[in-house]
UniProtKB/Swiss-Prot annotation:
The Tat signal sequence is essential for the expression of dmsA, the stability of the DmsAB dimer and membrane targeting. Despite the presence of a signal sequence, DmsA is not exported to the periplasm. Mo-bis(molybdopterin guanine dinucleotide) binds at residues 172-176, 205, 244-245, 270-271, 291-293, 386-387, 390, 488, 512-513, 701, 707-709, 788, 804-805. It comes from the Bacteria. Gene3D superfamilies: 2.40.40.20, 3.40.50.12440, 3.40.50.740, Dimethylsulfoxide Reductase, domain 2 (3.40.228.10). This is Dimethyl sulfoxide reductase DmsA. Binds 1 [4Fe-4S] cluster. Binds 1 molybdenum-bis(molybdopterin guanine dinucleotide) (Mo-bis-MGD) cofactor per subunit. Changing residue 106 to S: Electron transfer from the 4Fe-4S clusters of DmsB to the Mo-bisMGD of DmsA is blocked. Little effect on the coordination sphere of the molybdenum and only minor effects on its redox chemistry. Exported by the Tat system. The position of the signal peptide cleavage has been experimentally proven. Can also be exported by the Sec system. GO terms for cellular component: dimethyl sulfoxide reductase complex; outer membrane-bounded periplasmic space; plasma membrane. Keywords: 4Fe-4S, Cell membrane, Iron, Iron-sulfur, Membrane, Metal-binding, Molybdenum, Oxidoreductase, Signal. Inhibited by dithionite, sodium hydrogensulfite and tungstate. It is a peripheral membrane protein. Residues 1-45 form the signal peptide.
Length: 814
């Protein structure tokens, strides 16, 4: 029988020690993603086994945040209040069938998000300085009027290019409520009705890998489904940590473990931090200095080339630039990859295992052993997460890592992979149309603070402006919907604070959110949004292996306080801006949903009727091809199915990158190269700055949060405390013991947080889980453990992306 947790427990202030006592779960088990604390310690598959009160309703909802999974939630409601949360109980719960999509501990804590004391209750306008969090309550009518009047004024004075939609992924999985990419949001639809807005490209998650592998494979680099690992003999993960980032029953970690049980594939994890993806399930962990993955690959490639472990036939048929046979005529002599690795290229340095060892910290004999294993084991699933690319040299590193799959001919086959992150099967479900943006100009999503500060100085060749040679105006208005990148998730918080404090620069900031986040405190107008539990929507899957699904995210309870849906807000603004009919097309939110669902049923005939789906809660469909294999058609017939690269082949040497390197204006230390070489980038461990700041600081996705979402849920914070991870050798030098308060600092800021002394970190490296809520004192010393106090706003060379894992710091005991 289901054990229901008393409301008194749910409502209580929970200390870490008290949580252990309350749930009877201690030590490592408490933090395990396999548990659903404190809601249930037993998985129940059949609804009939759960007794419900006569006045209790069970309504389907969803967790729609940006974790890489989307999970169904079954809300138990009594008298209009959510009492407790369960997850998917449909299907045969067989890995090879329509298995259950079980939510992790984050999704199961949704009740605590809905009833959180941080909930925004009514519209407010700022009365203090930005960032102080001082607001006064206003009516919805006043809020709409202020926004509409000022937006019209700014468009008249500066043009639509001065209006910017900031990055926000808090409701990434929604259809009506979708918050990213900006062009797919209801705010974008509103702005498109009013003349458009300044767009952005790239994202904080994957800017460098998207740009880097575009020059290798053409477009977004696809990967094999993780379910295809059942055909693999070897799994190699570079900075890929699905055990924490995509840890639900609908996510990659489930497929990884289930598939490995079938194939018994060896798994090697290459990461500065021993992650939960390992946790005893891996066969080998190879710790590596952050930002040196390309050097490791080059050392591996040296062994594979000199010992004839490469797939020469694959390289000759499918690739450009491996050796002189396929090198473009425009390239310099010995400009090919093989020459670079063997030391016959321009630098004259052979990339031996000993050379790589000095850079990476990986012993040379281990590099030789790993090269031989990868080169002689096929098929091999070689993949990279998005941690290695979040560096100053991230674009070029992603191209280097993919070389292991290319050199061994593992691309386009079952059990192999492209070297990118895993792919998945998806259904063609129709989302809300947002019309066309009349403004063609866009900037990197990471450069918006510069666009406020020096917009008209930003150019295409220096700053990556797209659509025109330069910006004409600075950003004067920001829409910040369902996102915390206004301050918390954007790098170099102290610089951002200084820029946003001056309201003569960016004159209007509108924040739409459910909670008083760190970013919400910088709003001029603050609008309270409904949670996913307070409105109707569809939630679509993400990293879902070879079983795609759609969730009916029904309205569970009435909107709390004065909260409104994003559709109602934007419709009311459209009315004041004179574009109501164009925006709504005469439909309510539910009418739009029924309209989109009817279109989706045409594309997916197996979908039930709208009302049947509402009762059913989730629709699942397995990939009819069995396993998704990236670039399979290209492998089978490269002439009939060319890639979208200029050559139609895999471009090891990219003439397009050579042209960019010759024309762009780059600061000293930035490198763009036609080959996937190793370059340290700025602020690496080799930087002279390491004499002052001798530790590398990297980030990771912590299992208690999804970026900053769920960062204010008490039980999750208690179960998985925010701590700085440090190796015992580095701690001993500084007199630091486990649990000590430490200060982490560099020229950009200072953070005070407890230390976690653990051999799970490589010596010379410390780590902070990203997404902790920024909590500064009067001196702007952060007490919340927010890594972005310490990160830099200097962008990466090619993507102009966030190098969040490229940081040098010092650590001292407080």
């Amino acid at each position: 029988m289901k054990t229901k947790i008393p409301d008194a427990v749910l409502a209580a202030e929970v200390s870490r020690r008290g949580l252990v006592k309350t749930t009877a779960i201690g030590g490592l088990a408490m933090a395990s993603s396999a548990l659903t604390l404190p809601f249930s310690r037993i998985a129940h598959a059949v609804d009939s086994a759960i007794p419900t009160k006569s006045d209790e309703k069970v309504i389907w909802s969803a967790c729609t945040v940006n974790c890489g999974s989307r999970c169904p939630l079954r809300m138990h409601v009594v008298d209009g209040e959510i009492k407790y949360v369960e997850t998917d109980n449909t299907g045969d719960d067989n890995y090879d069938g329509l298995h259950q999509v079980r939510a992790c501990l984050r999704g199961r804590s949704m009740r605590r998000r809905v009833y959180n004391p941080d909930r925004l209750k009514y519209p407010m306008k700022r009365v203090g300085a930005r960032g102080e969090g001082k607001f006064e309550r206003i009516s919805w009518e006043e809020a709409y009027d202020i926004i509409a009047t000022n937006m019209q004024r700014l468009i008249k004075e500066y043009g639509n290019e001065s209006i910017y939609l900031n990055y926000g992924t808090g409701t990434l999985g929604g259809t009506m409520t979708r918050s990213w990419p900006p062009g797919n949001t209801l705010v974008a639809r509103l702005m498109n009705c009013c003349g458009g807005y300044l767009n952005h490209y790239g994202d904080y998650s994957s800017a460098q890998i998207a740009e880097g592998l575009n020059y290798t494979y053409g477009g977004w680099a696809d990967g094999n489904s993780p379910s295809d690992i059942e055909n693999s003999k070897l799994v190699v993960l570079f900075g890929n940590n699905p055990g924490e980032t995509r840890m639900s029953g609908g996510g990659v970690t489930y497929y990884l473990e289930q598939a490995r049980q079938k194939s018994n594939a060896r798994m090697i994890i290459i990461d500065p931090r021993y992650t939960d993806t390992g946790a005893g399930r891996e066969d080998e962990w190879i710790p590596i200095r952050p930002g040196t993955d390309a050097a490791l690959v080059n050392g591996l490639a040296y062994v594979m080339i000199t010992e004839n472990l490469v797939d020469q036939a694959f390289l000759d048929k499918y690739c450009v630039g491996y050796d002189e046979k396929t090198l473009p005529a425009s390239a310099p002599k010995n400009g090919h990859y093989k020459a670079y690795i063997l030391g016959e290229g321009p630098d004259g340095v052979a990339k031996t295992p000993e050379w790589a060892s000095q850079i990476t910290g990986v012993p040379a004999d281990k590099i030789i052993k790993l090269a031989r294993e990868i080169g002689s084991t096929k098929p091999a699933f070689i993949s990279q997460g998005w941690g290695p690319q979040r560096h100053a040299n991230g674009e070029i590193a992603t191209r280097a890592i993919s070389m292991l799959a290319i050199l061994t001919g593992n691309v386009g086959i079952n059990g192999g992979n492209s070297g990118a992150r895993e792919g998945s099967y998806s259904l063609p479900f129709v989302r809300m149309p947002t019309l066309e943006n009349p403004i063609q100009t866009s900037i990197s999503m990471f450069m918006w603070t510069d666009a406020i500060e020096r917009g008209p100085e930003m150019t295409a060749l220096r700053d990556g402006v797209r659509g025109k040679d330069k910006l004409d105006v600075p950003i004067k208005m920001i829409w910040n919907y369902a996102g915390n990148c206004l301050i918390n998730q954007h790098s170099e918080i102290n610089r951002t604070h200084e820029i946003l404090q001056d309201d003569k620069k960016c004159e209007l900031i509108v924040v739409i959110d459910c909670h008083m986040t760190s970013s919400a405190k910088y709003a001029d107008i603050l609008l309270p949004d409904c949670t996913a539990s307070e409105q109707m929507d569809f939630a679509l899957d993400a990293s879902c292996g070879n079983m795609s699904y759609v969730i009916f995210n029904d309205q569970v309870i009435k909107p709390r306080f004065e909260c409104k849906t994003i559709y109602e807000m934007t419709s009311e603004l459209a009315k004041r801006l004179g574009v109501e009919q164009q925006f709504t097309e005469g439909r309510t939110q539910e009418e739009w949903m029924r309209h989109l669902y009817a279109q989706s049923r045409e594309a997916i005939p197996e979908l039930p009727t709208f009302e049947e789906f509402r009762k059913q809660g989730i629709f699942k469909k397995r990939d009819p091809q069995g396993h998704h294999v990236a670039y399979k058609a290209f492998r089978e017939d490269p002439q009939a199915n060319p890639l979208t690269t200029p050559s139609g082949k895999i471009e090891i040497y990219s003439q397009a990158l050579a042209d960019i390197a010759a024309t762009w204006e780059l600061p000293e230390g930035d490198v763009i190269d036609p080959l996937p070489i190793y370059t340290p980038g700025f602020e690496s461990y080799q930087d002279p700055l390491n004499k002052q700041y001798p530790l590398q600081l990297t980030g990771f996705h912590y299992k208690s949060r999804v970026h900053s979402t769920y960062g204010n849920v008490d039980v999750l914070k208690a179960a998985c405390r925010q701590e700085m991870w440090i190796n015992p050798l580095d701690a001993q030098k500084r007199g630091i013991h486990n649990g000590d308060k430490v200060r982490i600092f560099n020229d950009r800021g200072e953070v005070h947080i407890e230390a976690k002394v653990t051999p799970r970190m490589m010596p010379g490296v410390v780590a902070l889980g990203e997404g902790a809520w920024y909590d500064p004192d009067a001196k702007r010393v952060d007490k919340g453990g927010c890594i972005n106090v310490l990160t830099t706003q200097r962008p990466s060379p090619l993507a102009k992306g966030n190098p969040s894992h490229t940081n040098l710091v010092q650590v001292e005991k407080v």
